[in-house]
Amino acid sequence: MATLLHIDSSVFPAEASASRSVTAAFRRTWEEQHPEGTVIYRDLAAVPVPHITADAWSAGYADPSERSTRQSAAFAARLELIEELERADVILIGAPMYNYTVPSTLKAWLDSVLLLGRTAGEAPSAQGTPTVVVASRGGSYAPGTPREDFEFVQNYLEAVLRSTLGLDLEFIVPELTMAPRNPAMSELLPLFESSRERAHSEAVTKAKELTERLTADNGR
């Protein structure tokens, strides 16, 4: 049975969050295609992962027999997250832009799962896992826009998820999400609506495509 690791990090509830809305569309389609499958869900806003500590960090590079009690406890929490990453056949991440980068809760999760010699290094343990990131943002930071150089979500996640963890990464980017609430952006409402519709369509399409891909891979 296929396993989906679904991570949300928006501080807003589903009805007020662009990223949650799109990840929900992906997940609904995924569950329709995998009625017997498993979903591991992490809502990092509701139940934050602890930020990395010296004990949690150093324990990852210490001989298990030599870890202190505090190191062992801290590493156990990391290990749970690492094993969820490794179990996943597909990973889905909601990553809204906050102050030009990812939410701190998502950064905390990444700091926990990135372990040199296991999930990172010469042979990352989750290498090749299909990963879809919904990178919503209030404005537009696309190439050619005035704030192109302020884009630190996709650039950062490319470095961590693709280059370091070796994941097979794709982005869905709902943009201009502040347009309905910001009168100064009223002229951009049609572009926002188009972006929202496209993002939901892409989520459904990608969920179906990944189902076909997994089916083909399992049939080999």
Curated annotation (Swiss-Prot):
Keywords: Flavoprotein, FMN, NAD, Oxidoreductase. GO terms for molecular function: electron transfer activity; FMN binding; oxidoreductase activity, acting on NAD(P)H as acceptor; oxidoreductase activity, acting on NAD(P)H, quinone or similar compound as acceptor. Belongs to the azoreductase type 1 family. It comes from the Bacteria. It comes from Streptomyces coelicolor (strain ATCC BAA-471 / A3(2) / M145). HAMAP family: Azoreductase_type1 (MF_01216). The gene is azoR. Its cofactor is FMN. Quinone reductase that provides resistance to thiol-specific stress caused by electrophilic quinones. This is FMN-dependent NADH:quinone oxidoreductase. The keyword Nucleotide-binding does not apply. Residues 200-220 are annotated as: Disordered.
